Structure formats: structure tokens, C-alpha cells
């Protein structure tokens, strides 16, 4: 079980060493919820958290048998409940997110089990649509993926809304490129701890590398 | 929670905001002896009578409810400090005073569970509520004055406040952005006047729903 020392904001190495898995899980949960697309599935983190949770569950059973002060037991139980809540919420978000997404990029990020779930889900959805609606439409419009045979892209699949805005806070001083392609490059600088409403696309890289948190 | 109808605007429920605030450290004074606690989320303790120690808010509340400790109200929660902050909030139309990110949640939990540990509780409570009102009002009026940009900086806004304005601000900023892009060549003046009109339309809807 990791210890939670006061992260004084000095060396990044120290912060890394002292951040508990629960902290990381909380961060992943928060980012995932606030982001408009699925973020990298934190498989290793989820597994570690699961392990720790199971360990504590066993410990609690031991405590109860050995008659340890019920107060202590209930406190450990509360901590356990909080960790479980985070884990469950995180997994649930992942599942919900790809009800709407079916792009290649998302597939790269999902875990194996989720891919299986997703393909099954997509197949069922497709069948459902076909049987109820599509067969009744004129021939050109029968595909689940394309609006009509004329469309070139899969435009019935909602694309992640990358241009939306999110609220974020940076951990350190960060300087970002505001404009893309041909427009005059402007930068926005974020001091540590500033809150920004900003376009998701701009901060996407920084979030992945852990410099910025979504709120 | 995860079952959101509009996937584009993610919202945290108030309970979730409170959940996140509960990891904040507060100071308590235990009145009993207890060994160190080795939680998944960290190690806390040991607990020695009359020796103050820092624990997460959720743990502090749990101990307090069982009569095992008293709270040391955080420094920012004194009547003097809060009065100062309230004055400063009222004076400035556009800046927010520095308050702990989760001040709303911390204050509420303390009022609910630790009334007797806060000196001048009623005074403190009404001060905090006044501060909340002034800040929310400030947020509302400021929202009408955005210029369309790609990034808006707001300093010292707290978690609850962010959560409340988040859906509206996101929609407004998106609208600005959408209208900004194809009109990069248009005269600056025309654009800013169009933005003014945009501002007038957007704020009305979501705010009136309250």
C-alpha cells in the first residue's frame, strides 16, 4: 500500500513516488469523465487497484475474526468502499463511452474484454437497427454506417467531439500552441494551478502526458 | 453518474464533487489512542490524545461522528479572514479571491458535523453563504462578457462553482468557436458586434431554468 506523503511540488520524481494508486485512479476517473473521448485505458493501474482492494478485503475479514476494534474495522471498510467506488465508476465510464464510439482510435485504447464487448454490442445494435428501421427505408439508405450510399465516410458514426471545451488545471508551467495550420501561432501559457476553459484539442497531448488535469 | 443523456457535456453530480473534496486534508485533535491506519489511500496516524494530526476529510467526519475527535477549523475559516474576503469579493467586479478549491464542500461538511468546534459558528456560516452568493453572482455577470477565444482563464474559482457553470460556458465557447473559424477574414468590428449579439442570446436560456 503506497504512502501518501505531502507532495510539496518539488521534484517530479518525488511526486510520482508518493502518489498512491487511489490518487492515480481518481485522476484517471476525473479525466475520463471530463474528456469528450475515451482516454487511454489504464490497465495496469486498474489491475493494481483491484489487487490492493482484494488484499484489504481479506485483511478486513481477518480483523473481524480476530476481534479487532470494530471502529478500526469500519474505518478500513470505508476506505475500501471509496476505492471500490472509484474503480467501478471508472470502468463504467469506459463501457458507456463506447456505446457512442466505434472509431479505430478507440479500439486501440480499449482493453481486450472491452473490445469483445464492443463488437458484440455493435453487432447487436446493427441487427436491431436493420430489423426495425433500415429495411423499411429505400435501398440507398440501408447502411448502419453511412447516411446514404453516396457518402464516402462513415458519417452515421458520431465522431468524438474534439473541439469541445473542457476545464483544466495544470500542474506546472505549460506553454501551448493555440492555433493550427497556417494561422499565426499563438501560445497560451498556463501557470501552475491556473484554471482554464480551453478547447480540448489543444490540451489533449498535455493530458496524456500527465501535465494537465481535467476538472 | 455514468448514464448521461448528453455525452458532450460531462457533468459531475454534487455528490461526486463532494466525494472528490473528501480527500482534502484537515486537522483534527483525537481524544483517544489508536494505531496508525494503513489505508489503500495512504497511511494516517498514529492517534494520540490532544496531539493534532492531519487526515482526509471523510476520515475526520467518520471519527467525529463516533465522538473520537474534535476538528481544528482551517485557518481560512476564521471570522476575520472571511469578513476580509467578503469585502474584497464585493469590491472587485471581475476577480475572485483565493479560497481553497473545495471550500464549499469543506464548509458544508464542517457545519453539518462539527458545529461545536467552530467558534462563532453562525457568523462563519452566514459569511460563507454570503461569499458564495457574491461569487456566483459575479460568475453570472462575467459570463456575459466573453470575447470569443480559444481559452478563457478564470482564477480562484472553486470546484462547485466550476461544476455549476460548466455546461453553459462550454456551450457558449463552442458557439463562439464555431462562428469564429469561417469568419477569420471578416472585418474585426463586424465579428465583435456579432459576438455581442451571440452573448445576448446564449446566457438567457440556461440561467432562467434555475
Curated annotation (Swiss-Prot), chain B:
Which keywords are on file for this protein? DNA replication, Nucleus
Name the predominant localization.
nucleus
**What Pfam families does this protein's entry cite?**
PSF2_N, Sld5
What the entry lists under InterPro entries is as follows:
GINS_A, GINS_bundle-like_dom_sf, GINS_Psf2, PSF2_N
Q: Which domain of life is it from?
A: Eukaryota
Fetch the PANTHER family from UniProt: DNA REPLICATION COMPLEX GINS PROTEIN PSF2
Member of which family? Belongs to the GINS2/PSF2 family.
Name of protein? DNA replication complex GINS protein PSF2
| The species this protein was found in | Arabidopsis thaliana
Gene encoding this chain? GINS2
